[in-house]
């Protein structure tokens, strides 16, 4: 095991510019697909998962533009097939379930990888999306979701406060028809960050940072876009 030795006794001074938090950046790039107008996410760190996210976006038909530390996305027709090589490299590929289901009408995703924290199943994601009207076919290697018409509002309680499932269902609720209540949700800062981004694009989300999220859905894509700098 590597060791880092720090010798103190010296004063520190100066300033640093913290990069945006990966836990916010990755779901924000997926959430940008829900916007009907161009979006920009700034302060993006040069991480492997960010590069994988850009590859995923290009694979489904998006055209992300990376300029310095800013990623820009404009609405384009999308397909719902996530390549196995991309999904297997990054746990955050699960964030694209709801956006691609909404944009393409169907999404097929090989089971995601990239996680060193042990198995983290996606059953809450799938159960919540099924409650909103999606049909779910889950196999040993991949999962396929389809919808007929817009997703519908629900009053849904998460089995446990999963951050990923909270983000997935929040994105779905923002574009569903009607007024959705999500109970027992995660309260991490990235939930608040993604909610702020979606609200800037025209969503109506309240309660981020509390155990209950309420959302008045747009019944389709959000009407606007947003420029957003994620939390550090």
Explain the meaning of each model-derived region:
Residues 1-232:
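Structural preference for solvent-exposed beta-strand-turn elements
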């Amino acid at each position: 095991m590597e060791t880092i030795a720090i010798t103190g006794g010296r004063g520190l001074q100066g300033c640093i510019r913290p990069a945006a938090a990966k836990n916010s950046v990755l779901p924000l790039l997926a959430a940008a697909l829900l916007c009907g107008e161009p979006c920009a996410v700034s302060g993006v760190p040069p991480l492997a998962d960010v590069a994988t996210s850009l590859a995923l976006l290009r694979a489904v038909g998006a055209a992300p533009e990376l300029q310095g530390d800013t990623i820009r996305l404009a609405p384009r027709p999308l397909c719902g097939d996530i390549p196995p090589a991309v999904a297997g490299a990054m746990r955050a590929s699960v964030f694209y379930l709801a956006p691609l289901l909404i944009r393409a009408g169907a999404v097929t995703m090989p089971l995601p990888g990239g996680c060193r924290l042990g198995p983290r199943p996606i059953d809450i994601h799938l159960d919540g999306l099924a409650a909103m009207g999606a049909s779910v076919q889950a196999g040993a290697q991949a999962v396929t979701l389809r919808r007929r018409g817009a997703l519908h509002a629900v009053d849904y309680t998460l089995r446990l406060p999963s951050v990923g499932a909270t983000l997935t269902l929040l994105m779905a609720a923002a574009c569903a028809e009607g007024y959705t209540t999500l109970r027992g949700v995660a309260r991490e800062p990235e939930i608040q960050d993604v909610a702020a981004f979606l609200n800037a694009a025209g969503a109506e989300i309240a309660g981020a940072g509390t155990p209950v999220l309420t959302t008045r859905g747009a019944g389709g894509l959000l009407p606007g876009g947003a420029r957003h700098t994620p939390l550090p």
